[in-house]
């Protein structure tokens, strides 16, 4: 079970609101060190293009990001992005996660993150060993530390 400080959730929502402006999707990554992978420590906002109905991460940014993660001993644990209304995992979300590893989590925040800070009406899904996605309860995967 991942542990995340409340400040990271607040930072996530602030970034979503600033980037998306209640008009566009936005995506972030939650990181943790390899020597303590269950304690999330950092939010990363990738360079991306976005619209109301999708986004694309810049490939040059991703290449540099992998190098930075290796140098700093960090790994991506959860990708987090917004949707314009209801939170769900679209076919595009299923097909293009940052990682395709079993157990990788994708969290979708509804309403471009303009609602209350937290996981109300959010959707969490996890890659299964066969490559499919399965919705999982947020409380079974993430603990918020006040």
Model-flagged regions — what are they?
Residues 79:
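Phosphate-binding glycine-rich loops of NTP-binding sites
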Residues 82:
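Short, well-ordered beta-to-alpha junction loops that form the rim of enzyme active sites
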Residues 1-76, 85-146:
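Conserved beta-strand-loop surface patch within small alpha/beta domains used
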């Amino acid at each position: 079970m991942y542990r995340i400080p409340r400040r990271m959730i607040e930072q996530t929502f602030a970034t979503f609101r600033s980037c998306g402006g209640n008009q566009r999707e936005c995506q972030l990554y939650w990181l943790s060190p390899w020597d303590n992978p269950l304690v999330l420590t950092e939010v990363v906002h990738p360079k991306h293009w976005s619209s109301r109905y999708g986004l694309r991460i810049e490939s040059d940014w991703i290449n540099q990001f992998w190098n930075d993660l290796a140098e700093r001993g960090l790994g991506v644990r959860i990708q987090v992005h917004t949707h314009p209304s209801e939170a769900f995992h679209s076919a595009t979300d299923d097909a293009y996660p940052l990682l395709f590893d079993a157990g990788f989590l994708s969290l979708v925040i509804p309403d471009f993150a303009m609602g209350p800070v937290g996981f109300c009406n959010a959707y969490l899904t996890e890659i299964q060993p066969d490559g499919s996605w399965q919705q999982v309860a947020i409380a079974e995967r993430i603990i918020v530390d006040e």
